[in-house]
């Protein structure tokens, strides 16, 4: 019989984050990324003294250079398209509105897809990084789901009826900037605000909180598994040691983590109550480093907050971790590019 399928398409995929730029190759529609190169991003983290516009230019020069180097590889067909995952809010037509972790303050709106198309001479698909990560799970998750990344910050996207739920101008999916602490001295957010969810429940926020707790209660800190690795110095506590202590059941670490996760539980409860999504996937370095401990403590707090109409079992069943790797954005942007660029063609297949 004759069926429609997508012609294979070799892509260069890139994930531009505030800390690291990852570039690799993928066949659109597959989940196998290869020839991945990781380099420090030439942005705010490395050149913080430069003006935002200069940093934006520097980042785009680096992105163009690294992608161009992957267009042709020994023993492989030339790439036919490019797909880029970008750490920042983006409009539906690929214009980056801000890059707080990349170039900090205000810079010109960046039509990243158009710029790269002009420079590289190939079709380019661009999307926000959390949007890209959500696309990795689109085929495997038959029901609507919310993907949340919990790393140095927090971001989310809801995938429903085959698309990401965001406004054409890119609004939506920025739950990390939801105000949850109204105190004037609340934890600072990278956007310049204070008391945002991402400043409290992220890996960075949770580390800030456990260090503050250690400084405030020296005796409890001294009894904690965190005291040894840090030499008894609160500011020497690391995320790695914090996650290890929490996984091992250390009371001090777990209670501090629990407090940090409470506003995230409130966010999940709000999303469920508002739009009825019953599947929440969590990725990001901090969440995945904590593993089942993250789900247990977040589940405890979600049960305490409550999800209207659900019992404890159904409430906890909504939470799950994504794959334990750092390829979410590379794989996901490849899947998104296949959906946008893949041209259907008729092929003969055996029934």
UniProtKB/Swiss-Prot annotation:
Keywords assigned by UniProt, alphabetized: Antibiotic biosynthesis, Kinase, Transferase
Catalytically driven reaction(s): valienone + ATP = valienone 7-phosphate + ADP + H(+); validone + ATP = validone 7-phosphate + ADP + H(+)
UniProt keyword Nuclease present: no
Effect of loss of the gene: Cells lacking this gene are unable to procduce validamycin A.
GO BP of this protein: antibiotic biosynthetic process
Cystine pairings recorded for this chain: none
Top enzyme category: transferase
Molecular-function annotations in GO: kinase activity
The EC number(s) this enzyme carries: 2.7.1.214
Pfam families to which the protein is assigned, alphabetical: ROK
Protein family (similarity comment): Belongs to the ROK (NagC/XylR) family.
Role noted for this protein: Involved in the biosynthesis of the antifungal agent validamycin A. Catalyzes the phosphorylation of valienone and validone to their 7-phosphate derivatives.
Protein name per the record: C(7)-cyclitol 7-kinase
Organism of this sequence: Streptomyces hygroscopicus subsp. jinggangensis (strain 5008)
């Amino acid at each position: 019989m004759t069926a429609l399928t997508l012609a294979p398409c070799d892509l260069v995929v890139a994930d531009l984050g505030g800390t690291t730029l990852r570039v690799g190759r993928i066949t659109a529609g597959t989940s196998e990324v290869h020839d991945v190169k990781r380099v420090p991003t030439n942005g705010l983290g490395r050149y913080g003294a430069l003006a935002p516009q200069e940093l934006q230019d520097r980042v785009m020069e680096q992105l163009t250079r690294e992608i161009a180097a992957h267009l042709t590889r020994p023993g492989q067909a030339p790439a036919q398209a490019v797909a880029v995952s970008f750490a920042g809010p983006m409009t539906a037509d690929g214009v980056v509105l801000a890059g707080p972790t990349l170039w900090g303050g205000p810079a010109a709106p960046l039509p990243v897809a158009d710029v790269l198309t002009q420079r590289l001479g190939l079709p380019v698909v661009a999307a926000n990084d959390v949007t890209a990560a959500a696309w990795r799970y689109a085929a495997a998750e038959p029901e609507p789901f919310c993907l949340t990344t919990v790393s140095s910050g927090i971001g989310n996207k809801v995938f429903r009826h085959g698309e990401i739920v965001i406004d054409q101008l890119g609004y939506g999916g920025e739950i990390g900037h939801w105000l949850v602490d109204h105190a004037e001295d609340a934890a600072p957010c990278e956007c310049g605000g204070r008391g945002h969810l991402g400043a409290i429940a992220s890996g960075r926020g949770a580390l800030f909180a456990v260090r503050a707790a250690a400084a405030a209660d020296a005796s409890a800190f001294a009894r904690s598994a965190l005291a040894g690795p840090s030499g008894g110095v609160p500011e020497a506590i690391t995320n790695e040691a914090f996650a290890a202590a929490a996984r091992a059941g250390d009371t001090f670490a777990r209670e501090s983590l629990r407090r940090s996760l409470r506003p995230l539980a409130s966010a999940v409860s709000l999303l469920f109550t508002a739009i009825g999504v019953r599947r929440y996937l969590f990725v990001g370095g901090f969440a995945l480093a904590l593993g089942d401990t993250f789900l247990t403590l977040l589940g405890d707090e979600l049960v305490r907050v409550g999800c209207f109409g659900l019992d404890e079992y159904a409430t906890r069943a909504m939470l799950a971790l994504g794959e334990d790797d750092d390829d979410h954005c590379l794989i996901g942007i490849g899947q998104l590019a296949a959906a946008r660029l893949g041209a259907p063609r008729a092929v003969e297949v055996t029934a």
